[in-house]
Design a protein with these regions (language model features):
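A short, N-terminal "cap"/entry segment at the start of jelly-roll beta-barrel domains
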Residues: 1-19, 54-131, 142-143, 214-224
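Glycine- and acidic-residue-biased ligand/ion/polar-headgroup-sensing regions
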Residues: 11-48, 137, 147-166
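Non-cytosolic beta-sheet module surface loops
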Residues: 26-28, 64, 145-147, 190-192
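Short acidic-glycine-tyrosine-enriched beta hairpin
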Residues: 36-61, 164-186
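Short, surface-exposed secondary-structure boundary micro-motifs
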Residues: 63-65, 181-184, 189-191, 206
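Structural motif
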Residues: 69, 159-161, 185
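A generic structured-segment signal
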Residues: 128-135, 140-146, 151-155, 176
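A short beta-to-alpha transition loop/helix N-cap that caps and shapes the active-site region
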Residues: 208-214
Length: 224
């Protein structure tokens, strides 16, 4: 594949380049907001054309966060590049909420949670001072920012890919901690292929905790 198109609100797969340098050129009819992952860097800007290179064996992804169609051209065929995360792998599947009882049995969920927020791709056990969040295999939460709170994350299991501010961290070990300040990008991706390997994180916050506080910059799970 030498070319692909991204509608507004859509992203490419997160891929790993092969042994050759890859040149990428993005074009659109007028200036538009674009986000790219180039290995460990997350960058966004408003542009009509954007050309960049991906080093051998490095990771890359393109997200259309603007309002115009993006046309992406590659100088090499990317068909054989390893897909680490496909945001739309379950796009046409049944969206069934996660059963909290399944998680409570498998993982030693501490007593004392006061609420549960279950979605089809993640589930959150809400405690008075922290949350425990589980993310299904091959799924990710939205790339988002908060306007009223900052968050601290601790990885509990699953070796996720973590976006924090403008950096991307791959296959993160248990016990690693991140601080996500207000209005800074953050997200978590579960790259595991096994259907039983959930990613789990502990989330704490400072400021005002309100689900309406979330601004989802890229939300692949809200399929249009």
């Amino acid at each position: 594949m030498l070319k692909e198109e991204l509608l507004p609100g859509r992203g490419s797969c997160l891929r790993r380049n092969n042994s050759e340098w890859l040149a990428v050129t993005i074009n659109c009819e007028s200036r538009s907001d674009i986000m790219i992952i180039n290995d460990t860097s997350l960058t966004n800007k408003c542009a009509q054309q954007w050309t960049f290179n991906i080093a051998p064996r490095k990771y890359y992804m393109i997200v259309n966060i603007g309002k115009n169609l993006l046309t992406i051209k590659y100088n090499n065929n990317i068909s054989e590049h390893e897909i680490i995360y496909d945001p739309y792998i379950y796009e046409n599947s049944e969206k069934k909420k996660i059963n909290p009882d399944d998680l409570v049995k498998k993982y030693s969920i501490p007593d004392g949670y006061i609420d549960i927020l279950s979605k089809w791709y993640s589930i959150k056990f809400i405690y008075p001072k922290y949350n425990i969040i589980f993310i299904k295999p091959e799924m990710g939460i939205s790339i988002q920012v908060h306007t009223l709170r900052s968050e601290k994350w601790e990885i509990l299991s699953g070796k996720p890919i973590v976006i924090s501010d403008n950096r991307v961290y791959y296959f993160v070990e248990k016990g690693t901690k991140f601080t996500n300040e207000k209005m800074k990008f953050h997200s978590i991706i579960n790259p595991n292929k096994s259907p039983k390997t959930f990613v789990a994180i502990k989330e704490q916050w400072s400021g005002s905790f309100d689900e309406e506080d979330i601004k989802r910059v890229y939300n692949p799970n809200n399929y249009q």
